[in-house]
Amino acid sequence: MPNVVVVGAQWGDEGKGKIVDLLTQYADVVVRFQGGNNAGHTLVVGGEKTVLHLIPSGILHPGKSCVIGNGVVIDPEVLVLEIDRLKAKGALKDDGQLVVSLDAHVIMPWHKAIDVAREQAMGEGKIGTTGRGIGPTYEDKVARRGLRIRDLLDEARLARKVKERAALAREELARLGAKLELDEPALVKRYAELGRRVAGYATDVSIWLHRALQQGKSLLFEGAQGTMLDVDHGTYPFVTSSNTVAGNAVVGCGLGPTAVDYVLGISKAYSTRVGGGPYPTELKDETGERLRKIGGEYGATTGRPRRTGWLDALALRYAVRVNGLSGIAMTKLDVLTGFDTVKIAVGYRLDGKVLDEMPSDPEVIERCTPVYEELPGWTEKLEHLRTWDDLPPRARAYVKRVEELAGVKVVGCSVGADRGETILVENPFLAR
């Protein structure tokens, strides 16, 4: 069986969790490789909703292993809370199901304080951070002063590092006009306890995954956020603090690029974005509100209403290119039911010219207006449909047009919130 990477092809919130949950039955191991608990996966199985922020979606499948790689930043309070909630639901019966990298960096209280203080200091220039300390934790990682999961397992080492790093954090917060109220001995005690709680799951993930591959096991890499939020390839600076594209899948868990056989991009049938930054197809009218209401477009992590708009083919084609997408899974196709017409942005108008590729400068993107192609809508409900041929002709025509514009095949469509409400045209794990 091949190894498959699943990444967001838009601005995040594309429904990756549902698709990963669906594909997990074909994989042996699900791997999370970047981001932190700023991402939220909402899964609906048998009508029961589960929201996960750190642990991979595949944990709801008995017998599957889930790995949190070195590229993820971990809030140990959140990790332990998710473990406890899953156990209370009857999931994670076998502790061997969850594997956590010893080298994953740890979100500390000062990271959250710095995150919030900086955002407040930016005023109208706010990026729209979740305030969960993700960015400052990645900064400390790059500056070679971060704490890792392995540091929580040695209380003396933890105490030394907390003392050093807390002093630096207080200095930075003072410059921002904020204070860090911290009882260092109590903090060390608490995080050492958290370390003991996760110690049984922590290991060298690179070795663990390499052995899994040697045993012939198949891997499913689960991305967080989306392509347009990638720190290098997104609409910088309105991005997240990690690489969200497929190339980071192996870097974030300690494998080489030859471990990947197929890259699946997830895209909504329309588009959404959370936080600031350019968004050419944004709808600030009744249509945008209608998409938000029908699609339930509120953040799984923050509860913030998402910005909504029509599908942007230029952004999608960009995602195909920078990820090397093998195929696309389209989610929330059912949300478009009932619209008289549906639109796709096929170009940008800028200074009297029409562009057919997304500019690399976000300030230029901000000045662009979309050139739309309109297609007839459909009125039929889609939730009960399970095959491609069952879809209404106009819905099929819409999907095929997206396929033509993106340049890769749409291999699946989500027609409802539940795991089973999905049409899989081509299974990435069976593709050759």
UniProtKB/Swiss-Prot annotation:
Residues that coordinate or bind IMP: D13, E14, G15, K16, N38, A39, G40, H41, T130, R144, Q225, T240, R304
Residue positions binding substrate: A300, T301, T302, G303, R304, P305, R306
Keywords noted in UniProt: Cytoplasm, GTP-binding, Ligase, Magnesium, Metal-binding, Nucleotide-binding, Purine biosynthesis
InterPro entries, per the entry: Adenylosuccin_syn_GTP-bd (IPR018220), Adenylosuccin_syn_Lys_AS (IPR033128), Adenylosuccinate_synth_dom1 (IPR042109), Adenylosuccinate_synth_dom2 (IPR042110), Adenylosuccinate_synth_dom3 (IPR042111), Adenylosuccinate_synthetase (IPR001114), P-loop_NTPase (IPR027417)
Chain sites annotated for binding Mg(2+): D13, G40
GO molecular function: adenylosuccinate synthase activity; GTP binding; magnesium ion binding
Main location group: cytoplasm
Keyword Cytoplasm in record: yes
Active site: D13 (proton acceptor), H41 (proton donor)
NCBIfam families: PRK01117.1, purA
Protein name (Swiss-Prot/TrEMBL): Adenylosuccinate synthetase
Organism: Anaeromyxobacter dehalogenans (strain 2CP-C)
